[in-house]
Amino acid sequence: MLNDFQVFDYEDIQLIPAKCVVKSRAEADTRVKFGNHTFRLPVVPSNMQTIIDESVAEELARGGYFYIMHRFDEEGRKPFVKQMHEKGLIASISVGVKDYEYDFVSSLKEDAPEYITIDIAHGHSDSVIKMIQHIKKELPETFVIAGNVGTPEAVRELENAGADATKVGIGPGKVCITKVKTGFGTGGWQLSALRWCSKVARKPIIADGGIRTHGDIAKSIRFGASMVMIGSLFAGHIESPGETIEIDGDKFKEYYGSASEYQKGAYKNVEGKKILLPAKGHLQDTLTEMEQDLQSSISYAGGRDLHSLTRVDYVIVKNSIWNGDAH
């Protein structure tokens, strides 16, 4: 089935420049329409406890950025939706697939969030399909994102069940060790998986995991993503919820995966790890730099907006793009 399938990842690809048509990169438009709303960038911070909390979500929403609140403060989700709506901001939350989540979804009818993400490690499952159908029945106006998946069959099934977008990526992230613990996943070929899935997708795809540089955002869009979910690049900021730790005078912040023992509590099956990242500056500085770099990407693509990135040529260079630079 996969004999003539090209396998590559972000560091194996270089996009090929086209004639520039803008006077300055500032003319390039990085906005993306996703569901009924338009956002400043096609990126979304990972819905993980060390990346996003209520205050980060509010800052992102006020700034015109997409966000997805994590699902690990279950009791806080309904009040969160109410608070965001009272502030005139969009509400975007996550749910799992356990039985009690069905009642929770039904309880949102009076104040439905604009976006719900069904967030489990292996999203190609009957339990996810059932939950998509339940949300669509109870909250027909809510935009449903479902994942995570790694195959065209999964994308087709979730779309057919009613998902408005699918999240592609099984374990390619920096703090995800699914590939090591289970032998399964898209680690090492995430960009190929994205391309493979996008060929059958009729609805938007969120590329989730494996992003290490701002240039990887442009590459994700080239291979079919409408939105790019990023963990490690958004971790460790002053505003980030992770705990700050000082070692020999240097400050670090904790960052761990959604399926880690720190996330789940002890004695549960674990597919994530905890790492310390050097503490960064403000979140807005990273968002601004991402926007400027993406504007440069658009100018190299020979266009004025994100769509131009979908048409550029590319070469497969097998890890040589670093030219001896440290990873």
UniProtKB/Swiss-Prot annotation:
InterPro entries: Aldolase_TIM (IPR013785), GMP_reductase (IPR050139), GuaC_type_2 (IPR005994), IMP_DH/GMP_Rdtase_CS (IPR015875), IMP_DH_GMPRt (IPR001093)
Enzyme nomenclature, EC number: 1.7.1.7
UniProt source species: Streptococcus gordonii (strain Challis / ATCC 35105 / BCRC 15272 / CH1 / DL1 / V288)
The keyword NADP appears for this protein: yes
Enzyme class: oxidoreductase
Function description: Catalyzes the irreversible NADPH-dependent deamination of GMP to IMP. It functions in the conversion of nucleobase, nucleoside and nucleotide derivatives of G to A nucleotides, and in maintaining the intracellular balance of A and G nucleotides.
Pfam families: IMPDH
The reaction(s) this protein catalyses: IMP + NH4(+) + NADP(+) = GMP + NADPH + 2 H(+)
Heme recorded as keyword: no
Annotated GO CC locations: cytosol; GMP reductase complex
Binding site for NADP(+): 205-228
GO biological process: purine nucleotide metabolic process
Listed Gene3D superfamilies: Aldolase class I
Name of the molecule in the record: GMP reductase
Molecular functions (GO terms): GMP reductase activity
Cysteine pairings via disulfide bonds: none
Family assignment from sequence similarity: Belongs to the IMPDH/GMPR family. GuaC type 2 subfamily.
Source lineage: Bacteria, Bacillati, Bacillota, Bacilli, Lactobacillales
